Amino acid sequence: MVATARHIKEKDPEARVVFIGPCAAKKLEASRTYIRSYVDFVITFEELAGMFDALEIIPEELEESPIEFTATGAGRGYAVAGGVANAIEKCINEYYPGTEVKIQHAEGLAECKKMLTLAKAGKLNGYMIEGMGCPGGCVAGVGTIIPV
């Protein structure tokens, strides 16, 4: 979120950057002083659906407009549990073939806490850890509107 927002603001300082996603924690992240200047608003899918309902907007009835996708599949997978680590592993394998990559994953706060405790004690078999607070990853966050 922040890297994309920073890139947009560098290209157009007057742009309004709105992050829309299922993750309620992004609201807290965007309120941090060093991020606030890049991200103007954070809206969950649930909040967006509420806005559509209040304004009687039915997305399925709107005219489609062409979208230019420039993101990689690896980048779009960030929000799924294991997605960040998977993207990093793909990059390492591409730029440094033959390099061993040891990754540990955790989903849910209890599992993340357990993994961090093991890492702190030196009992984790991996040198990169990825923890997703929500089981299933960000796509299954509290602000989602469909089951994942």
Predicted feature residues:
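Iron-sulfur-associated redox domains of electron-transfer enzymes in respiratory
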Residues: 1-148
